[in-house]
Amino acid sequence: MKTVYEIQQFLKQFGTIIYVGDRIADLELMEAELTELYHAQLIDVKDFQTARLLLRHEIQFLKEKRKS
């Protein structure tokens, strides 16, 4: 997974569609859902780590952008 869109499509395979209207909240909910899937052993560690890193990077980018 290389984009947030790919993570959304990945989560959709598990029946999860996240949209609350706030981009940062959406990303944080995606991260929480990925964590739940990982703890339930439904996704492997590589997919989990890659997706989580990408989401955290995007969240940090958006938070810094809001401050400016």
Residue ranges and their predicted role:
Residues 22, 26, 49, 63-66:
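Residue-level detector of alpha-helical recognition elements and their boundaries
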Residues 11, 39-45, 66-68:
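Short, structured secondary-structure boundary patches
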Residues 15-18, 38, 63:
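Short amphipathic alpha-helical interaction patches enriched in hydrophobic/aromatic residues
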